């Protein structure tokens, strides 16, 4: 016994090696190309995703990304390492989606189908969707820890009083 030999208590502290998988589901639809205060919603989502990604590598976790609109635009499988994170951030900054619409159901169903082991999934979106995604989210939440982060601009809810104006749906 170490305590008996050295005549003082010996405490060994174990640090858990978690190696979680973190998935970022990033909405790249046209509704994120809006911003009035300091930045576009797309830039805000990218900044949040980059912060989460760097936090994941600090914990030695794997990080993966699903870019989605009304379809899966791109999937980057979870991996570890700084090089992988920099690749993900470069993709986030340069990504050009094929569609402007949003289907959150498709993204969550893809997550449950592709990621086999339990993970922590962050959904970054403005959640301007036409379909109800609550049932699919509950199914995904049985297997994964799903966290929704809403990217929001206050002007999206309050239109300025400027009279008649032309509005185009993305």
Cite the ranges covered by each PLM segment.
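An amphipathic, basic-hydrophobic helix/alpha-beta surface used to engage anionic
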Residues: 1-74, 78, 110, 120-123, ...
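Short, flexible loop segments at the rims of nucleotide/cofactor-binding pockets, characterized by
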Residues: 2, 97-101, 125
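Short low-complexity, flexible loop/linker segments enriched in glycine and/or proline
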Residues: 80-81, 163
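Von Willebrand factor
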Residues: 84-119, 131, 151-155
């Amino acid at each position: 016994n170490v305590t008996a030999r050295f005549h003082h208590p010996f405490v060994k502290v174990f640090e858990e090696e978690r190696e979680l998988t973190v998935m970022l589901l990033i909405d790249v639809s046209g509704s994120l190309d809006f911003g009035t205060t300091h930045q576009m919603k797309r830039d805000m989502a990218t900044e949040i995703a980059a912060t989460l990604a760097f936090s994941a590598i600090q914990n030695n976790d794997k990080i993966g990304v699903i870019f989605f609109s009304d379809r899966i635009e791109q999937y980057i499988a979870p991996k570890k390492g700084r090089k992988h994170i920099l690749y993900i951030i470069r993709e986030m900054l340069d990504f050009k989606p094929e569609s402007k619409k949003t289907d959150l159901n498709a993204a969550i169903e893809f997550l449950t189908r592709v990621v086999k082991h339990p993970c922590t999934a962050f959904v970054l979106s403005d959640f301007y969707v036409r379909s109800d995604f609550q049932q699919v989210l509950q199914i995904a939440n049985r297997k994964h820890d799903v966290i929704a982060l809403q990217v929001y601009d206050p002007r999206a809810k309050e239109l300025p009083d400027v009279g008649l104006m032309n509005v185009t749906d993305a």
